[in-house]
Amino acid sequence: MIQVDKQLIRDLYDKAVVNPRLRQNMDLRNSPDDNGQRMLNALMPGTVVPIHRHPMSNETVICLSGKLVEVIYEEDDIAKDFPMGMDAQDVPSGRRLKESARYMLDPSLGNFGCVVPAGAWHTVQVLEPSVIFEVKDGKYGEDGSEIF
């Protein structure tokens, strides 16, 4: 059994602060074959979480400590009129993103978490050292996740 307590949170913070990525996760699955993903993630200010999405799963994010902003993006239509002889294949990614929502996660204010809809592009901005509990459907590496 794993008990999530103050000592575990402190240990995650201690590891995150010395990690070059400024974050540290702890896998809470029973085995790599689990059909769901459950983890704690300690995030330090300055960490960069690339904009990404999970096309086949919602992502539940609960902030256990700290303060961060979950930022949601939506795809913006690319230019509809291309110069003569060009089409959408000539646009590098064929898509752009625009910010559509921001959710402050701060348990001290009673804002504990959010559910990011399947397919929504998102990232986090860490305002102070934070630990989140994340849950997604599907096996790790097989859930269709992609980075923008």
Residue spans for each PLM region:
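Short beta-strand His + acidic residue motifs that chelate non-heme Fe in jelly-roll/DSBH
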Residues: 50-52, 70-71, 114-116, 122-127, ...
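Conserved short histidine dyad/triad with adjacent acidic residue
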Residues: 40-56
